[in-house]
Amino acid sequence: VGTVVLERLVRELNGVECTDFEPEPPPSKATAVTRCFGEPVREVAALREAMVRRAVRAAEKIRAQDLAATRLIAFAHGSRFKPNAPSASRIARLSPATNDPRVIGGMAGRMADVMYETGGVYTKCGVMLEGLEPMTAHQADLFAVPDPRSPALLAAIDGLNGRFGRN
């Protein structure tokens, strides 16, 4: 008695090919950047800064894979060991899909402002980007006026981050 995975493993060890070789892994469907704070955060400005940093890092991750996100999820919470600790999350639709850290970071900062509870003590926050799709496949906004300088700016930012680091 075993599982399907165990059965496949036994067959593979006996020389029977069960799955096709994938030279490239399939593209990600979501990515997340979450971190606990080194010390508790009590100010909205500190929470906003942390949320924006995580959002920009998540945007960098999907841009490196040439993907765009259609949904942004942000969360922040206090210690799970303390009663009545603050806990909040927000979901936003990104239309059109984007991997621009200026857009994603700006939205995450606004979400942090909305989630913040006065007097709350936060120990962790994070950002998830979902609904990832290839940049070539996403549908553009019919009425948007694209900035022709934007791709060059993002490439320059990526180059600087690659050369000097993110901080």
Feature annotation, model-predicted:
Residues 94-167:
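Acidic, metal-coordinating catalytic segment for phosphate/diphosphate chemistry
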